[in-house]
Regions:
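Short gly/ser-rich loop at a beta-strand->alpha-helix junction or flexible surface loop bordering the NTP-binding
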Residues: 1-150, 159-173
Length: 173
């Protein structure tokens, strides 16, 4: 929820509301600005993943609900773990990079997270479309480590990516 001055600024067109996050400028933020904006909204230990990381990389979809991973050490309190619903970073699956001082999953790890977790298939498909071409995604070895439900979701997302690529060939690479 925005404060009254923020709401007034948004209404007057001097700032933006990006999925509930306040951006104090009238233009859409660049990648480094998106990373900094998300960094202000997260605890210091949080690593954006899924739709949040996809939004930082592509600017497509919404960054909310904020999805994060947590480091193995130091361990978080059970209350904090429950509040953020943060899964643990796995070195075998996740590659973390730095964007404007914010740790974030790299594009390939973000794609795998979008394929296997989350709720919104359309948003995931759009973010994946801008992250990588479909040809590079299919048959990725990490896909073999997915559970049956994650694999089913991945197939639904990839089908939506194919539909988007056919419907909007001018935006595909």
């Amino acid at each position: 929820m925005h404060t009254p001055p923020e709401h007034s600024s948004i209404s007057d067109g001097y700032s933006l509301s990006l999925g509930g996050l306040y951006w104090p400028r009238p233009y859409f933020p660049s990648r480094t600005e998106r990373a900094a904006l998300i960094g202000q909204s997260l605890p210091h230990w949080a690593i954006p993943t899924g739709n949040t990381a996809g939004w930082i990389w592509t600017g497509m979809g919404l960054p909310t609900p904020l999805t994060v991973l947590r480091p193995s050490t130091p361990a978080l309190s059970p209350l904090e773990r429950e509040h953020w619903r943060a899964r643990e970073v796995r070195d075998s699956r996740h590659t973390v990079v730095d964007v404007a001082g914010q740790s974030i999953l790299d594009p390939l790890s973000t794609e795998i997270e979008l394929l296997s977790h989350g709720r919104d298939i359309d948003s995931a498909a759009t973010q994946i479309l801008f992250l990588r071409t479909l040809r590079e995604l299919e048959g990725h070895p990490i896909a073999t480590r997915m559970s049956p439900s994650q694999r089913e979701r991945a197939h639904a997302v990839l089908q939506r990516v194919r539909e988007l690529a056919e419907r909007y060939p001018d935006i595909t690479r």
